[in-house]
């Protein structure tokens, strides 16, 4: 069958009329070099700082260096199969992570993908990992406590909701233990917790998760993990991802606690990325913006006022303030708190808990050094009873340290000095506490009351720990109603003082100390 020219032209016209062009405009570039997780891309003229770049194989990179004729980007995930000449695309998006209550009780990676083998994560949407911190007008002063369950911290270095309290010390001084106990103590407080593990061994993190589960705290906690074997990019981004998950609760009028364990490793990961991107190194080879790295993260921990929460939730939540409390951890080298990263984070935070190797090795655990540990805003958040009873503890320890140094050279000491030394030794013993054994406000108050009002004067130093354990057990058994009242109100008046005195007097009659 032959077609004449008219039929052919009609057929072509018909085909042209039916042809449907689906146009997809995207900014495309070409990889010009790949090395150590860093790619250089030519041709992405419209890329933005921090934008996600789509790579072959459903992977992404983040644009960090925008140069005249190329873009330096860091790959999130494996990069061994990337090669020069491969095409990449702009996405027009910045990195987002899943947020919501469905993440509680789960272990996720930096990108929010589950790694605990419990199936997919339920989320209430996505949040960008980088967010601007609330402004001054949107904040409210810190006046509600976060109880860590540690006598030494809650009495001398109190932490408030919305505060940033640095935990700093050498390796193996109990920094993680203190933070984990603080999370365990929030089981019944209603405070949601986020634990961000940066650059740690997978076995260490598995142990932490197991402990949280054993003590019933995992259901209240999101664990964000970037292990030592993961890329520097994921270690650098993990704290921001965890912070976005914590902000979900803060912005909805709830309270959250986030632990960054630890920011020293994040700074090292960021230094690695910066050096590979050929950014100019500064002090200790860190880049010039390492202060901004931590300040923009820690400023997001805040207590926001009811107006902010109401505006954010579009009127769904009224009259409630929200808070995100941060416990960043920094590891020092041989107790050097004057190094670059420690001094940066000390200047950003609202106080620090300094843990000392010497104290830890001499059996004083938690190894808190009360001399240089401080809480700049937490005092306003302390409960009345703790504020009233904790004042003498810090003074007693300060006097004891001064006299202990002096008494090494003086052989004959007067009675007053001996009493102060003895009292200081007993208070030091009293502040010792086992791991995974947080104490309630009432239990702490009872123990501090005993020290403050001289009930330990006739107790031998060696028996102080057993005296405390027996006293707390006796009070829990015989006076649970009073302890519950103190836990609920936190008040201290003549009536409560009289009852506490009565408990101690009757307890001391039960056996000789």
Curated annotation (Swiss-Prot):
It comes from the Bacteria. ATP binds at residues 169-176. InterPro entries: ATP_synth_asu-like_sf, ATP_synth_asu_C, ATP_synth_asu_C_sf, ATP_synth_F1_a_nt-bd_dom, ATP_synth_F1_asu, ATPase_a/bsu_AS, ATPase_F1/V1/A1_a/bsu_N, ATPase_F1/V1/A1_a/bsu_N_sf. It is a peripheral membrane protein. Produces ATP from ADP in the presence of a proton gradient across the membrane. The alpha chain is a regulatory subunit. PANTHER family: ATP SYNTHASE SUBUNIT ALPHA, MITOCHONDRIAL. This is ATP synthase subunit alpha. It comes from Serratia proteamaculans (strain 568). The gene is atpA.
